[in-house]
Amino acid sequence: MRGLLDVGADDLLVQVSAGPGAEEPETGEIHVLRVNELGTERLSTEPGVHGAVRGGPVTVLVSSVLERPGQRARVLRGGEEIAVVASHAESPVIAPRPTLTRAGKSKIPAAVLLPSGYREGDGPLPVLLDPYGGPHGQRVLAAHNAYLTPQWFADQGFAVIVADGRGTPGHSPAWEKAIRHEFTATLDDQVEAVHALAEEFPLDLSRVSIRGWSYGGYLAALAVLRRPDVFHAGIAGAPVTDWRLYDTHYTERYLGDPAEDDGEVYARNSLVTDEGLSAAAGQHRPLMIVHGLADDNVVAAHTLRLSSALLAAGRPHEVLPLSGVTHMTPQEQVAENLLLLQVDFLKRSLGMA
């Protein structure tokens, strides 16, 4: 059960991660069901990501699928299609080719993307993990547009992995709650995913990188600092580095009261403490940190504290401050050039240049 969309006089409209009779979530799929005393009716018939709104007898079903770009909006009355809302959105120039799967013993939802021109005889590829990996952020979706940026990175010569480990939605309540007091478990799942997928896909485990933004930025920095045996380069965008500095309503939900246990839970899950780097491994790996100086969500102090701690520990790193940019990068020119800078950093760091 993902959400309650509408309550009718004699039925409910709900959003779910699996259809009737399914024993576990269908990887990347979100469906719309009509439920009444007679049973359930699945309004979304094709695999994909579906949502709906309803007013009286009319339902508008909005669908995204892997095979076509954008969204398709259908108008239904009494379960029958009466109209399709025309879309005038531009068609993307990239055609993603993700393989959706479940990785490892934990059955971690994952998507794998290879370069468009890749052939089986081309050999193993440098790896780029591209997770969000935290609460409220599902990245593995059966939707075309979800993989435009990952496919672009793949076309630069990488095998790209998007994995939704513990803490992400769409799996089960227990899956989401498994990270209580232990955000670092999300890193364990990325490690499990890449090792398991290497048994099925052409991955060069001697050249593994990771990039992410927000929670994904935290995860990317955590990866190169705590597991340099697995990750050889990382790009951390707008990372939370000290959980004491982030929103109370979010952080205390998962990590509890920072005053308890002498702050040990917060220190263990943060990248930096007042004493410097937190539980960093001895081996150094290249790390680029990117942060918008106008970010009012994850404030730039997070990156400044991490950079200061890295410098104090004698660890080389790169910091890219983005003047006038908030938590995301909606400016087209900035976003485009930022992608190019990231590819350049990854290729230099992995010896691909």
Regions found by a protein language model. Name each.
Residues A22-L33, E67-V75:
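Structural motif
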Residues R54-A353:
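Serine-hydrolase catalytic core recognition
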Residues G8, L13-E26, L61-E67:
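Beta-strand C-termini and the immediately following turn/loop, strongest in propeller blades
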Residues V16, G28, R34-E37, L43-V49, ...:
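Ampipathic, surface-exposed secondary-structure segments
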Residues D6, E26, V53-R54, G104:
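Residue-level signal for WD-repeat beta-propeller blades
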Residues M1-G8, S17-G21, V35-H50, G78-R102:
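Multi-bladed beta-propeller domains
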